[in-house]
A protein has these predicted regions:
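Phosphate/nucleotide-binding beta-alpha loop and adjacent structural elements of enzyme active sites
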Residues: 2-168
Length: 168
């Protein structure tokens, strides 16, 4: 019966997602943002941060709790973003910062090419702002976030190991 309802809803251009998944993700975002900024502010005030590695830096603006601290305190930072489209924006958004090293890779065990899934940019306006930065090696991860299968594209990206990354 649920399959029939899902097909009808899908034919109308909608998708059913678990209510608790959506509700929990919103609650976590709110709590996480408050706590993260407080913790970072405290660490910086006490001079406990001098280098940062940010995995999944996206464009350096959206949902980025670190950007203001990196710029304000001139922190040395290694910013990693696998999706070429987002990486170009990241590069542009930090172009005036001399303390930044940028890496266009995903993290994996080895240096290799892997398939990563993301929302096709043609469909961004159909979703909430967070889908812009939503990408994964698993297509099911995007579907779990309410992205329709036909709105997902794959992209071959470069990967590197943590060890190799930290040696850069």
């Amino acid at each position: 019966m649920l399959k029939i309802i899902k097909k009808i809803i899908s034919a109308l251009g909608y998708k059913l997602i678990e209510k608790k998944l959506y509700k929990n993700s919103i609650n976590l975002e709110i709590l996480n943002a408050i706590n993260t900024k407080d913790v970072l502010r405290n660490l910086y005030k006490n001079n406990l941060v001098n280098k940062i590695v940010q995995i999944g830096a996206n464009d350096g603006l959206r949902f980025d709790e670190l950007r203001s601290f990196i710029i304000e305190f001139n922190t040395k930072a290694l910013l990693v973003e696998p999706i070429p489209e987002y990486f170009l924006n990241l590069k542009n958004n930090y172009k005036d910062q001399k303390n930044i090293v940028l890496e266009n890779s995903a993290i994996s065990v080895n240096e290799e090419q892997k398939i990563m899934f993301k929302v096709d940019s043609k469909f961004y306006e159909l979703y909430q702002d967070h889908v812009y930065g939503l990408s994964s090696f698993k297509k099911s991860h995007l579907i779990k976030h309410g992205v329709r299968n036909k709105h997902i594209i794959s992209e071959k990206i470069k990967t590197t190991s943590i060890k190799d990354l930290l040696n850069k």
